[in-house]
Each structure stands twice: as structure tokens, then as C-alpha cells.
Amino acid sequence: MKLKIDIATNNFKHGGGTERYTLDLVKGLNRQNITPAVYATKFDHGIPEYALIEPHLVDQHRTLKKLRSFLFSSRLAQTRKNSAAKLIACHHADYADLLICGGTHLGYLHHMAQKPNLLDRLAIRRNRSNYATAKLIMAHSHMMRRELVGLYGVPPEKIQ
């Protein structure tokens, strides 16, 4: 039986951070003869990696721009409702088999010495849900690991 992988990301394009990580992940899976289904709000059809995926649009064009990140997880769930594949989340998504964590909102606020406003509180709530429902979390640094455990109460054994 061939392994089926879904990847959730905001934008499938060349860029920094999670965009680069997503493209590297797609290329690595392709070398293993796995064609992932990629769920994203936007796709760059002109990049070579586009030919290596099965694209699925997470439609958010009717959602207010400031709220898109908060509603991505529910739109993703609707879009992939018939998928039995393992989910790798490179963007905010609940119930991921593997959640990629490059930063936490509480950590950002702490390091910037800022108090949370309404949008920050929504982002923190979204983070808590994403971390609580993920089976595994890959923290990109020791600092991320400390923030996940210390600020969000994520069990250390859940973090890779």
C-alpha cells in the first residue's frame, strides 16, 4: 500500500520560511515516489515543484484578509473531508499527524514585550488548538520547544 500524504500550507510558492520548507518536503517525498496532495490558499503554477503535487485549493477568497489565518483550519477540514491521508501541517491546522512549528505567538509577544490585543488572543487560541490536536510537533529550535512546553503546556514527548 502506497503512503498517502497531505500537506497543508498557506501559499505554495518560492519564498522563505514555511514556503521553502514545504517545497523541500515535496521534493523529498517525490524522491521516495510519493506524490503529496498539497492544500493551499494560493499556488504558483509556474514553479517546477507544482508538477510534483496534487493541488487542492483551500478557498478563502470570501474571507476577510485579517481572519483568513484563523479560519484556515476549518476550511482545510472541509476541503479534505474525504482524505484518509496523513496530514503534515506547515500552516495553522488542527488534527495534524505532524505539525511543523517555526514559531509561537505567545513567544513572539513575550520577546517583543507586547500585551496581546484581540487578534493576538485569537492567534493564541488558534495555536493552543493546533498544538493540542496535533499527534506530533516538530519544533525548529530548542527555543520553540521551550515555548511549546512552557507557554502552551505541550507534553515534551509530543515534540520532536
Q: What positions do the PLM features span?
A:
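Active-site proximal beta-strand in glycosyltransferases
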Residues: I88-A123, M138, I159-Q160
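A conserved, positively charged/aromatic
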Residues: Q78-R80, Y108-N117, R128-K135
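N-terminal strand-loop element at the rim of the active site
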Residues: T9-G15, G28-L64, G153
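Membrane-proximal helix-turn-helix segments that form the acceptor-binding/catalytic region
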Residues: L119-H140, R145-R146, L151-G153
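Short, well-ordered alpha-helix to beta-strand connector turns
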Residues: N33, S83-A85, A96, A134-K135
